[in-house]
Amino acid sequence: MKVPKSNVSVIGGAGHIGLPLSCYIASKGHKVTIVDINENIINNLRDDKLPFNEVNLQHYWKEAKKNKIKLSTKTQSIKDSEFIIITLGSSSKTKDIKIFDKVLDDVLQNAPLQSKIILRSTINIDTIEKIEKNKLFVQKNLKLAYCPERIAEGMSLEELPTMPQIIGVKDDSEYRIFKDFFESIDILG
């Protein structure tokens, strides 16, 4: 099934995982909003200053700008997103878990009805269950997929279209939704 071009927000979108992914998705014609709390990096991106080296990132950034990629430091900017991708760096440290949980709460508060959330971050084992039991998640009829990032930093734009994509979901109908999205950006399912 061909997926129409969607509004996509990438949380942590200016980081080593999020920025290449955001640019790649925008280059496929989706309307992308990069959401990142790091104001300095967001301002540098507005001035076309990329925060790190990545093979082909400059090229994809130019393509993303042609497709009017948006930049924001506010989670509220996801309010029109059909797909919300979370790409935060994470670890088992209590501080990192609290940051991740806070971002997740912000996402659930601001996500529009029936939007689809893709977790690409490494997460604790109980995270999926915790999200699916969240009152806002249920009330808003959100969908959730765990699609871990498995690419090499610095080579992600080379590996994205060739690395098989793991899609962890609750049932077959949800699998189809997320598989169609990944196929729309030429990432193998």
Regions found by a protein language model. Name each.
Residues 2-49:
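NAD(P)+-binding Rossmann beta1-loop-alpha1 motif at the extreme N-terminus of oxidoreductases
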Residues 29, 81-82, 114, 163:
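Short, well-ordered alpha-helix to beta-strand connector turns
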Residues 50-69:
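N-terminal glycine-rich dinucleotide-binding loop that anchors FAD/FMN and/or NAD(P) in oxidoreductases
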Residues 67-81:
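Short acidic low-complexity segments
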Residues 87-88, 121, 170:
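Glycine-rich, N-terminal phosphate-binding loop of Rossmann-like dinucleotide-binding domains
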Residues 92-153:
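Rossmann-like NAD(P)(H) cofactor-binding subdomain of soluble oxidoreductases
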Residues 110, 132-145, 151, 157-189:
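Internal alpha-helical scaffold of NAD(P)-dependent oxidoreductase catalytic cores
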